[in-house]
Amino acid sequence: NQSAGGKGGGGEEGGGDGVFTVVEQPPTFPGGENALIAYIAKHLKYPQVALEQEIQGVVKLRFVVMPDGTVGDVVIQQGLESHCDKEAVRVVKSLPRFIPGKQQGKPVAVWYSLPIRFVIM
């Protein structure tokens, strides 16, 4: 798992749910990883409670990029604080469509890991 952005994976199903963790062609965000980071930076709203308590850190999320490129299930792998966790999930659910991952030339559902940083500037 990377610190700056996300990672799809290469040809194994994770957990028997029909969602791949590793595929031949991982899902990609339109415009690439820098565009994904910029989207999150623009749309992430620092929770007031977290600001007041000077809470900073990373929420590690995992979500499914569906065969149509939309975001499916979102799972918090490592939380920070409840308000920050909810905001990270909200932003991920608002992401525009990805270019879906492919296995044997067909679009498939793929898990995608993404750390979201909360830093007070």
Model regions and ranges:
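Intrinsic-disorder/low-complexity signature in envelope-associated proteins
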Residues: N1-P30
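Short proline/glycine- and basic residue-enriched helix-capping loop/turn segments at helix->loop/beta transitions
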Residues: P26-V64, E87-M121
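A short acidic/small-residue loop/turn micro-motif
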Residues: Q77-C84
